[in-house]
A protein has these predicted regions:
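Localized sequence-composition bias
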Residues: 1-167
Length: 167
């Protein structure tokens, strides 16, 4: 199954936007991933920083505040996490037309894993664009030693250190 999923997701810059839904007033035009060295890639090392660059189109005639969430889903279903500006109380305001938003995921805590990426864009809690399995990336081995914390069993996730920048 993992092999099939890896082969069914394009590793090129030609992403598939066929599996999308939402109102469409604000839409994701492209998503690019960069490593700590600024190189566009889909392979990362443990403890690396992933820079998610989202190019968005605001079709409305005014500035709008939006919420963006990036879901990282393990291909083997062993991991599911979300990066979102709402978690950090960070406002993202888009101008009319094209906009660029960056989410930096710092100190990548994964090793030897493969992930699918979903992107959700909302305005006033209404889904404007939801693109599923838009991109595939993998984390290859690396050396990473870090102080860790064991979360209680009733805690349903882990916090991933990230920040948002509007360009």
């Amino acid at each position: 199954i993992t092999h099939y999923q890896e082969k069914s997701i394009s590793n090129s810059a030609e992403y598939s936007f066929s599996n999308r839904s939402g109102l469409g007033n604000i839409m994701l035009e492209s998503l690019n991933l960069f490593n700590s060295l600024g190189k566009e890639t889909q392979q990362f090392k443990t403890s690396d920083t992933i820079k998610f660059v989202l190019n968005l189109k605001n079709k409305m005639t005014k500035k709008v505040n939006i919420q963006i969430a990036i879901r990282l889903k393990g291909v083997d279903q062993s991991f599911d996490a979300m990066l979102a500006n709402e978690y950090l109380d960070k406002n993202i305001t888009l101008n009319q037309g094209s906009n660029s938003v960056v989410c930096n995921l710092h100190n990548l805590p994964f090793s030897n894993s493969s992930f699918l990426v979903n992107v959700l864009i909302k305005k006033n809690q209404v889904i404007e664009d939801f693109v599923q399995d838009i991109l595939y990336f993998e984390v290859i081995g690396g050396f990473f030693q870090k102080e860790s914390y064991v979360y209680p069993n009733n805690y349903k996730g882990i916090y991933l250190e990230h920040d948002w920048i509007i360009k």
